[in-house]
Regions:
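Short, aromatic/His-centered strand-loop micro-motif at the edge of beta-sheets
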Residues: 110-116
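Exposed extracellular interaction/assembly regions and N-terminal maturation sites
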Residues: 2-102
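Extracellular disulfide-bonded cysteine-rich modules/repeats
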Residues: 24-26, 118-125
Length: 125
């Protein structure tokens, strides 16, 4: 039976007898992903006109797996930060951007909360 991937954090679930000689590195990566999800922090510089898409890669560290995301950069238009819609996760998002424009945190197929142009606060998403 081959390895599978967990639904929420995209951890590698190793099948019995798989990954001879490499299971330790896979386990270490899984532990680092758990650390990211529980207490991880990343500052994400937004593109001035389009925002950013948070990555959420199977079996790997990814900025979208962090608990706390600080949005930075100077924005020159209303922008979106796209989070994955295939997972259920709570984020703490700090809007530390400059520029008199909005930032909406949403999934690619949905809607989400918007930071107003003057709203430089923290939101739970």
């Amino acid at each position: 039976m081959p390895n599978t991937t967990s639904a929420s954090l995209k951890l590698t679930v190793q099948a019995t007898g798989e990954n001879s000689g490499t299971w330790g590195q896979i386990t270490n990566t899984n532990l680092l992903i758990l650390e990211q999800a529980i207490g991880g922090y990343d500052a994400v510089a937004l593109n001035a006109t389009t925002g950013a898409t948070l990555a959420y890669t199977n079996g790997a560290l990814s900025n979208g797996k962090n608990k706390v995301i600080k949005l930075t950069g100077t924005i020159t238009a209303n922008v979106n930060v796209i989070i994955p819609d295939s997972v259920e996760k709570t984020y703490i998002i700090e809007n530390a951007t400059s520029g008199a424009f909005t930032v909406t945190v949403k999934t690619s197929s949905g809607t989400g909360p918007t930071f107003a142009a003057t709203d430089k606060t923290i939101k739970l998403v």
